[in-house]
Every structure is written in C-alpha cells, then in structure tokens.
C-alpha cells in the first residue's frame, strides 16, 4: 500500500487561520503515526502549487515528487510582495517566482526528492517506483523526523544565510553549479544529468 496526496493549495483563508493551523497539526501528527508503516508521498504539479501551512504538511510526508511547473513554499509570492514590497519580490515576474518556488529550485535544495515530467503518466510511474522502495531508502529521503535532520537543515540554513544570496541562482552556485543561469532553460533530462544538489545530509 502507498498513500498519494496531490497538493493544490494556497493555504487557509486568514479568517480561518486558527482552525487551519489546528488541522495542519493534526495532519502532520497523523503522518508521523504512519511513518514506517505506509509510504506517504506528496505530489505537486498543479498550477496553484502548495503554499501556506500545507507546505509544512507536504514537508512532513516521506517523499515529495514535483514536476518542473509545480511550486512549493510557505508564504506565497503575492503575499511576500504585499508585505515586503515589489522591490523585494515581484510576484508578476514568473521567472523569479519559479526560480524561487519551482521544481528545479526545490530539487536543488533538497525539498523535492524526485523531479519528473509534467504529465499524469510520469506521476503514475514515479509512484509505482516508490511503492517498491525498501523502507530504509524511504526513511533517508524524509526532511523531518530526527534531531540529526534538524541539525543538518539548520546548518544548511546558516550557510546559505551567511552567503547573503540575492537570487536563487546564487544558491544553485553554492551547490557547485558553475553556470547556474544555464539550468533555467535546460530540458528536464539534461537538467537531471548535470545539476548538482546541496548536500543537506552533510551540512
């Protein structure tokens, strides 16, 4: 058995924030209960993406599968622009939005385990492959669930923060990609063959 969750959400409405936070916590608690019993896979490939508190829920699953057009984050682009100003983040700049929240970026920084083609067939095939994985391999792909993982994530966050990146491409360069701009327009197969990812587990 395997649990597949297709995330397509911008988060809860602000006037339902408290109830939404409680629901998120309950979902994450249930995901921890399922840990080691049934693989739970987040699938993100819609036009809306996965934002708000549901970003936390997605992060609590065992594995995240994204297409290049999928987006994942906590605060959505429009809210960032509203709160910080367009000079800080222009939500109408699609290239910027996808460099920051899109599948390629999330794959490089380790938030996404598998980056696949933008088709239902690709998602079905990836789910079938995941269903056959041994538990130790699935457990190793989790983003949360142990003090060691927390320490690794915090170390990576500190490293990135100290570098003061002004764009996602600066983070890609930190991962060892010597020509980060070239990754933007690469087709999926070429991208996966050439990209270097941040070594979260070694951070």
Regions found by a protein language model. Give the residues of each.
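A structural preference for short, pocket-lining loop segments at secondary-structure junctions
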Residues: 1-13
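Amphipathic alpha-helical segments at domain termini/boundaries
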Residues: 82-203
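Conserved catalytic cores of soluble enzyme domains
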Residues: 11-139
């Amino acid at each position: 058995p395997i649990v597949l969750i297709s995330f397509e959400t911008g988060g809860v409405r602000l006037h339902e924030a408290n109830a939404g936070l409680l629901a998120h916590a309950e979902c994450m608690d249930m995901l921890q209960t399922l840990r080691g019993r049934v693989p739970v896979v987040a699938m993100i490939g819609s036009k809306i993406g996965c934002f708000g508190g549901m970003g936390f829920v997605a992060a609590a699953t065992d594995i995240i599968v994204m297409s290049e057009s999928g987006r994942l984050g906590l605060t959505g682009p429009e809210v960032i622009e509203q709160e910080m100003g367009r000079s800080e983040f222009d939500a109408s700049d699609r290239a910027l939005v996808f460099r920051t929240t899109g599948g390629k970026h999330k794959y490089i920084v380790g938030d996404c385990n598998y980056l696949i083609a933008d088709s239902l067939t690709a998602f079905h095939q990836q789910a079938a492959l995941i269903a056959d994985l041994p538990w130790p391999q699935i457990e190793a792909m989790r983003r949360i669930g142990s003090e060691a993982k927390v320490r690794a994530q915090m170390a990576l966050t500190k490293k990135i923060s100290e570098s003061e990146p002004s764009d996602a491409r600066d983070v890609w360069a930190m991962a060892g990609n010597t020509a980060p701009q070239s990754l933007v327009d690469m087709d999926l197969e070429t991208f996966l063959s050439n990209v270097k990812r941040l070594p979260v587990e070694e951070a």
